[in-house]
Amino acid sequence: MADLLGSILSSMEKPPTVHDQESRRKAREQAARLKKLEEDERRKKAEFRKKMEKEVSEFIKDSTLQKKKYNPMGKIERSILHDVAEVAGLTSFSFGEDEESRYVMLFKKEFAPSDEELEAYRKGEEWDPQKAEERRRLKEKAALEEEAASHTQKRPASPNSNYRDKYSHLIGTSAAKDAAHTLQANRAYGCVPVANKRDTRSIEEAMNEIRAKKRQKKGDEEAAGSGSSV
């Protein structure tokens, strides 16, 4: 009986010691602090969102502004600002090399940044529209010059140039130029000067006329001889 009573008493929960009471008290205090921190965090986020909504609204109403740059802020704040901007119909980007320097820029939809402008911000550079326009003009000019040079290289050399370059060291530049002009103008005659062909035909005609006259003269003389002998 005594053994049974002793077993029952030993199985019963022992009253907490002073150490256990202190541990439970600290646990309750820690839970209360965590709850308070969470409530403070929610309150701060709500206040920050409300502040950003007001600033974004003012930015949209100001027709003189195209973009708005914020100071560096934490990841949570950047996330809230991006969300507010999206709801308001704005375009937003984060820039900065590290977490400490990252910031947010807002852009109105009608003034969305170009790829060149975004690249400048990513490099940590200031965007200058005038300098960018000058670089664009120079780039276009260089492209046009390169295209013109390419067409010039592909263009075949003219007969004038070939003839002039080939024979200028023998007959002189002026003579070569005149000869090239003559050949170009009279290509239908097999590149032989037209004057030579005209002269040749005139001589042949003249010789035929001379032969005909000689034959006629000889015939006249023979006729005259026959008449005198009779």
From Swiss-Prot:
Alphabetic keyword roster: Phosphoprotein
Region (Disordered) residue spans: 1-45, 119-169, 185-230
UniProt-listed Pfam families: R3H
Phosphoprotein is among the record's keywords: yes
SMART domains: R3H
PANTHER family for the chain: SPERM ASSOCIATED ANTIGEN 7, SPERM-ASSOCIATED ANTIGEN 7
Name under which the protein is recorded: Sperm-associated antigen 7 homolog
Annotated organism of origin: Danio rerio
Lineage: Eukaryota, Metazoa, Chordata, Craniata, Vertebrata
